[in-house]
């Protein structure tokens, strides 16, 4: 009876192999179910065919087909073919199975997710190649079906899933570093990055690998997953192979050094002087051999199991000792260099991990692996205690920007389910917060001084004092009202409609996002952009969001003439600071302060009498301006804002050009709306400036065969001519996001706003 069952299974296996290898292609999925009585390969996978007996397959298939349009999953028939290597295509084993995949999953991730669902590892899934076969057609690679990076499984297989076979070719390659660089793809790069990010953060990885930090984040988060060039994948594959080989070599050197130290101890034990020898007289080679032979041959209680039990010549022993010392020296130098590169992550401050050296090993392991769910509250408490800005804390704690820290605090994801990149950042913040309070304060002070020195050395010297119309009394008064303003917040009408009011106010007053964000909430344009993008429901439990919206509500509650006067005042201050002559950049700080005092006195003397609606003295003008942080807390942000004031909205700085060129190198010249949104918030530039830059680069590539060389100088997109702009991407981006405020559909309004800003700059 068992023999008959085996014969039946062998017959089914041969029929399945014939169907799979038939060039005409397999029949429809429903017909295949009716012929075999069970999904192909079920018997070989341990599933019995008896479970399907008595079930009308036509009826179940019909129900499955009718219910799939309402569900979120699609069945895909997969045939996995194992090969010994990529050159010899001798099929080793076949594995056929149905896999349920999500409809909203990206189509270019179908192979990887199918293999993961079948129980294969990430490394195996990364090395696989897939072909898709529809009906009796010839199988083709998935990349031939569509090149749209955002195409989903439902878009491609919704109507043909019952006649589709996904053929996956899996090559036997034990490790990613053994994979040839020519076979590296987007999937292998992403899995390799995920593996590397378990031991280091993105910034330290970007310093070593050929990918930039923004590109690493995009690949890991699948943002630009399909836009990585094949040449970049191969370059990363070559680097990864060299990196893993070097790392394995370091591990071997470490183990060899430990072994050599133990071996040296045992050799010294065997080289005890024989009677007649003195300590001053070194033993002769014959005596060394004579003295060491009995001790090595006789089993020692503490002899290392890896040591050989046969006699070793003195020359070989000396060579091994010299080699072990050399390896130890090289390893010590490498560790020293690695420690120096690690310190660069923390802006030349000692790494936070060093504080746990005196702790037991169990505590070190727990602090390195577990992140408390209270980390977000700890960060907020630290910001309040030290009176520092998010920009300063983000730089010294985990070497990131203020925007990323604000996004992390806004979402508050559970560390247990967080992504690997977020977990690295949370662990870095937690390690930093476990430093002594005095040491943290010293690091904050060093960072403030460093940012001040860098600002005075790099660009136009920022005005450290506030404009004369904003005395310190206004700040203290408004801060007091903010701290004691809980009843005021409760009486305010703060709901989801405040986002529409912000947009209407910017349209009415014709002010930019940067200007409104500064006067209403003392924030940057990127912060306001993210605020209006997500439009979270205001709630007092989300304290940070509630306080920021309360400041905006207080500002919007002011009379319209007062708001317009504040806009005008801030705009004049921006133009006044931006029109300073370039020769003042290298003037000593004492002369700059004297000039500032003279300018303030002149402005106070020449200032006309205030208009009738504002006869009150200046201390009562507190509600007009939003509360600010203390001057010490926001020194780094004020420096950044002052540097941004000096640059018109159409100018791209050298640093921003470097980021844009890195983006072009990694992604290309055709950014989507999300990429434009990200670059605009990251570089604090309007969208029309970003778009015109890419249009000009595409024009030069099309008509001149190469990208425009800016030679390390600032770029002003207002100087571009209309014929130098290739506008083949704007319409598609506008149609895709026609209903959002921050879509490229507003490019015309932004360009008009940008031209008015430029004209105002020229007039001033």
From Swiss-Prot:
What is its biological role? Answer: Required for the switching of fetal globin species, and beta- and gamma-globin genes regulation during erythroid differentiation. Plays a role in chromatin organization and nuclear architecture during apoptosis. Crucial silencing factor contributing to the initiation of X inactivation mediated by Xist RNA that occurs during embryogenesis and in lymphoma. Binds to DNA at special AT-rich sequences, the consensus SATB1-binding sequence (CSBS), at nuclear matrix- or scaffold-associated regions. Thought to recognize the sugar-phosphate structure of double-stranded DNA.
| Official protein name in the record | DNA-binding protein SATB1
According to UniProt, where does the site described as Cleavage lie? 254-255
Q: Where is this motif: Nuclear localization signal?
A: 20-40
Species this chain originates from: Mus musculus (Mouse)
According to the UniProt entry, which residue ranges have a biased composition of type Pro residues? Answer: 607-629
Glycyl lysine isopeptide (Lys-Gly) (interchain with G-Cter in SUMO2) crosslink location in chain: 51
Q: Does the keyword Mitochondrion apply?
A: no
Q: Name the gene behind this protein.
A: Satb1
In alphabetical order, the GO MF annotations are: chromatin binding; DNA binding; DNA-binding transcription factor activity; DNA-binding transcription factor binding
Classification via Pfam families: CUT (PF02376), CUTL (PF16557), Homeodomain (PF00046), ULD (PF16534)
- Does the keyword DNA-binding belong to this entry? yes
What region holds the CMP domain?
71-172
Query: What processes does the entry annotate via GO biological process terms?
Result: activated T cell proliferation; CD4-positive, alpha-beta T cell differentiation; CD8-positive, alpha-beta T cell differentiation; chromatin organization; chromatin remodeling; epidermis development; negative regulation of transcription by RNA polymerase II; reflex
Residues bearing Phosphoserine? Answer: 185, 638
Keyword annotations: Acetylation, Chromatin regulator, Chromosomal rearrangement, DNA-binding, Homeobox, Isopeptide bond, Nucleus, Phosphoprotein, Repeat, Repressor, Transcription, Transcription regulation, Ubl conjugation
Q: Which domain of life is it from?
A: Eukaryota
Cross-linked residues for Glycyl lysine isopeptide (Lys-Gly) (interchain with G-Cter in SUMO) are 745
Q: In which tissues is it expressed?
A: Expressed in the subventricular zone, rostral migratory stream and in the olfactory bulb (at protein level). Mainly expressed in thymus, spleen, and lymph nodes with a lower level observed in the brain.
Chain intervals with Polar residues compositional bias:
266-296
Q: Where are the N6-acetyllysine modifications?
A: 136
Region Disordered: list its residue ranges. 1-56, 266-307, 450-474, 591-650
Post-translational modification (record): Sumoylated. Sumoylation promotes cleavage by caspases.
Q: Which InterPro entries match?
A: CUT_dom, CUTL, HD, Homeodomain-like_sf, Lambda_DNA-bd_dom_sf, SATB1/SATB2, SATB_CUTL_sf, SATB_ULD_sf
Gene Ontology, cellular component aspect: chromatin; heterochromatin; nuclear matrix; PML body
Output compositional bias ranges, type Gly residues.
43-52
């Amino acid at each position: 009876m068992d023999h008959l069952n085996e014969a039946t299974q062998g017959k089914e296996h041969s029929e399945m192999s014939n169907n799979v290898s038939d060039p005409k292609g397999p029949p429809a999925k429903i017909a295949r179910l009716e012929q075999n009585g069970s999904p192909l390969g079920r018997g070989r996978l341990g599933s019995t065919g008896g479970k399907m007996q008595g079930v009308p397959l036509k009826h179940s298939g019909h129900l499955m087909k009718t219910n799939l349009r309402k569900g979120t999953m699609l069945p895909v028939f997969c045939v996995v073919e194992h090969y010994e290597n990529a050159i010899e295509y001798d099929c080793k084993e076949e594995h056929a199975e149905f896999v349920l995949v999500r409809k909203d999953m990206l189509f270019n991730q179908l192979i990887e997710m199918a293999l993961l669902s079948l129980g294969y590892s990430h490394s195996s899934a990364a090395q696989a190649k897939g072909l898709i076969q529809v009906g009796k057609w010839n199988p083709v690679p998935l990349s031939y079906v569509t090149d749209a990076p955002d195409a989903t499984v439902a878009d491609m297989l919704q109507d043909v899933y019952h006649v589709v076979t996904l053929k996956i070719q899996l090559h036997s390659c034990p490790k990613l570093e053994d994979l040839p660089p020519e076979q590296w793809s987007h999937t292998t790069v992403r899995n390799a990055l995920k593996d590397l990010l378990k031991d280091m953060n993105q910034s330290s990885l970007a310093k070593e690998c050929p990918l930039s930090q923004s590109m690493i984040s995009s690949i890991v988060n699948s943002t630009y997953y399909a836009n990585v060039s094949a040449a970049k994948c191969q370059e990363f594959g070559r680097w990864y192979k060299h990196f893993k080989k070097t790392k394995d070599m370091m591990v071997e050197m470490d183990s060899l050094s430990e072994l050599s130290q133990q071996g040296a101890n045992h050799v010294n034990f065997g080289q005890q002087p024989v009677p007649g020898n003195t300590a001053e007289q070194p033993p002769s080679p014959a005596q060394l051999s004579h003295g060491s032979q009995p001790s090595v041959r006789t089993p020692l209680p503490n002899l290392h199991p890896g040591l050989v039990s046969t006699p070793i010549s003195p020359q070989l022993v000396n060579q091994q000792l010299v080699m072990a010392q050399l390896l130890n020296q090289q390893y010590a130098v490498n560790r020293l260099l690695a420690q120096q590169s690690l310190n660069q992550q923390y802006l030349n401050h000692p790494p936070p991990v060093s504080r746990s050296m005196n702790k037991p090993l169990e505590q070190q392991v727990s602090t390195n692996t577990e992140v408390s769910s209270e980390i977000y509250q700890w960060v907020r408490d630290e910001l309040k205690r030290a009176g520092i800005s998010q920009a300063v804390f983000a730089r010294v704690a985990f070497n990131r920007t203020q925007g990323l820290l604000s996004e992390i605090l806004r979402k508050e994801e559970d560390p247990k389910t967080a992504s690997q990149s977020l977990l690295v950042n949370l662990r870095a913040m937690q390690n930093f917060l476990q430093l002594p309070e005095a040491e943290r304060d010293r690091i904050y002070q060093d960072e403030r001084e460093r940012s001040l020195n860098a600002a005075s050395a790099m660009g136009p010297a920022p005005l450290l004092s506030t404009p004369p119309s904003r005395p310190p009394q206004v700040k203290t008064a408004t801060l007091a009202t903010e701290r004691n303003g809980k009843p005021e917040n409760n009486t305010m009408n703060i709901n989801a409609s405040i986002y529409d009011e912000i947009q209407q106010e910017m349209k009415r007053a014709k002010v930019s996002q940067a200007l409104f964000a500064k006067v209403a909430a003392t924030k940057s344009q990127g912060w306001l952009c993210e605020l209006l993008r997500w439009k979270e429901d205001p709630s007092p439990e989300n304290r940070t969001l509630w306080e920021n919206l309360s400041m905006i509500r207080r500002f919007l509650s002011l009379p319209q003439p007062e708001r317009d006067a504040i806009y005008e005042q801030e705009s004049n201050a921006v133009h006044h600071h931006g029109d300073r002559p370039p020769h003042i950049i290298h003037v000593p700080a004492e002369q700059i302060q004297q000039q500032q005092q003279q300018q303030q006195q002149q402005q106070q003397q020449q200032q006309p009498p205030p208009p009738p609606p504002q006869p009150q003295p200046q201390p009562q003008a507190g509600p007009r301006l939003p509360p600010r942080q203390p001057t010490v807390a926001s020194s780094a942000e004020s420096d950044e804002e002052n540097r941004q004031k000096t640059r018109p909205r159409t100018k791209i700085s050298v640093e921003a050009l470097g980021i844009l060129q890195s983006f072009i190198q990694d992604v290309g010249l055709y950014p989507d709306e999300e990429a434009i949104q990200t670059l605009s918030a990251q570089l604090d530039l309007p969208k029309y400036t970003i778009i015109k830059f890419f249009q000009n680069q595409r024009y030069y590539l099309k008509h001149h065969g190469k990208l425009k060389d800016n030679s390390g100088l600032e770029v002003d997109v207002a100087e571009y001519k209309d014929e130098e702009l290739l506008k083949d991407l704007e319409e598609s981006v506008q149609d895709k996001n026609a209903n959002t405020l921050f879509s490229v559909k507003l490019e015309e309004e932004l360009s008009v706003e940008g031209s008015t800003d430029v004209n105002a700059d020229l007039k001033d």
